[in-house]
Amino acid sequence: MNDRKDPILYIVIPCYNEQEVLPITAPLFLQKINDLAASGKISPDSRVLFVNDGSRDRTWEIINELAASDEHYVGICQSRNRGHQNAVLAGLMEARDRCDITISIDCDGQDDINAMDGMVDAYRDGCDVVYGVRS
């Protein structure tokens, strides 16, 4: 991995039946990675990791299309629906040996992705754990 001044970030996004919102929110997550990398806060090797949690719609197909369109998108697929927390855990376990920072966020766009800037800054300043609470 890198040092704290050039960390690799993985944004872990659990997805269950997200075919409607995924095409809207995925580019926002990618733009956040690109913006943070362009500002020198994270490594350009950072990724957006989608975890398909046994969706019954086109979610997994869309994740595969995204991954084929840009190397910064990656995805894993659970064989069946295991629940939100297990999907987050699966993503964290997948990412743990590939990055310095993991941030989990829901796919629906209800959380402020700009909060990631402060989280990355806190990590770069020496924090090992940073969390946000929606207000």
Q: Which ranges hold each PLM region?
A:
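Structured catalytic core of nucleotide-sugar glycosyltransferases
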Residues: 1-135
